[in-house]
């Protein structure tokens, strides 16, 4: 499947992520964020949806972001910086909806997530990851509502496509599109990915190459 990205963009995306990516900063709170710089792209989503794994798949570096089978792995806003000439950062976010953590911690993560999404001018795009097996839940809607209020452009990425049959995937994608009609600030189109197989990863890289191109103009 192609998601509309042409060969030139796919190549630009490939080059962007073939460059050197490294960890630069971890913020446990809104007060400790790095100074705003360049183009920032954040990955949000429920705990365990595959945010950190997708960052690893994009950068081709299997251990850049810490992943875990247990929800609640990423507990801070983690910043990764791309090649110097690109001036781009990826932000791995803590997951939301992690029910078995202490209440105070859930509240503090949730507040950090919403504050970051509302108040970060250098944030150029947020990818909201949704598990292909589950689709959009109420807890995701809260994030979409926050994003509707912020000026940042955002897009839904269905993850773990390898876990779902093709027919079910098509239904889930369609249902997700239908739900998005209620969120005019969202990209109407939905990306489908698997960090395990690499499905959809070149298209996501291409989308980011396009975004950076738009910001450098
Ligand atoms: N089958 C399959 N499993 C995946 C995929 N991506 C991630 N996983 C698994 O899902 C689990 C969670 O992955 P993470 O990348 O740590 O998820 P996260 O969203 O960063 O989780 P938190 O940091 O806890 O919010 C791990 O066991 C991964 O191996 C995928 O594309 N396919
Ligand atoms: Mg994580």
Swiss-Prot record:
One of its GO terms (molecular function) is metal ion binding. Keywords: Cell cycle, Cell division, GTP-binding, Magnesium, Metal-binding, Nucleotide-binding, Septation. GO terms for cellular component: cytosol. Its cofactor is Mg(2+). It comes from the Bacteria. The keyword Kinase does not apply. GO terms for biological process: division septum assembly. GTP binds at residues 45-52, 72-76, 92-95, 159-162, 193-195. Residues 37-214 form the EngB-type G domain. The keyword Cell division applies. Pfam families: MMR_HSR1. Mg(2+) binds at residues 52, 74. Belongs to the TRAFAC class TrmE-Era-EngA-EngB-Septin-like GTPase superfamily. EngB GTPase family. Necessary for normal cell division and for the maintenance of normal septation. This is Probable GTP-binding protein EngB. It comes from Nitrobacter hamburgensis (strain DSM 10229 / NCIMB 13809 / X14). The gene is engB.
């Amino acid at each position: 499947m192609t998601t509309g990205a042409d060969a030139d963009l796919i190549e630009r995306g490939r080059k962007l992520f073939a460059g050197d990516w490294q960890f630069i900063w971890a913020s446990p709170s809104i007060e400790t964020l790095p100074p705003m710089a360049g183009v920032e792209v954040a990955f949000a989503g429920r705990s365990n949806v595959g945010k950190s794994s997708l960052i690893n798949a994009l950068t081709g570096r299997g251990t850049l972001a810490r992943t875990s089978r247990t929800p609640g792995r990423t507990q801070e806003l983690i910043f990764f910086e791309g090649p110097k000439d690109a001036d781009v950062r990826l932000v791995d976010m803590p997951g939301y909806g992690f029910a078995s953590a202490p209440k105070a911690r859930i509240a503090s993560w949730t507040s950090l997530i919403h504050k970051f999404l509302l108040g970060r001018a250098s944030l150029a795009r947020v990818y909201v990851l949704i598990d292909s097996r589950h689709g959009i839940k109420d807890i995701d809607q809260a994030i979409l509502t926050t994003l509707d209020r912020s000026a940042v452009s955002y897009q839904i990425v269905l993850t773990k496509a390898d876990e779902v049959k093709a027919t079910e995937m098509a239904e889930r994608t369609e249902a997700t599109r239908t739900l998005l009609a209620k969120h005019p600030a969202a990209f109407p189109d939905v990306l489908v990915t698997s960090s395990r197989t690499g499905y959809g990863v070149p298209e996501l890289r291409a989308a980011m190459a396009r975004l950076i191109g738009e910001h450098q103009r």
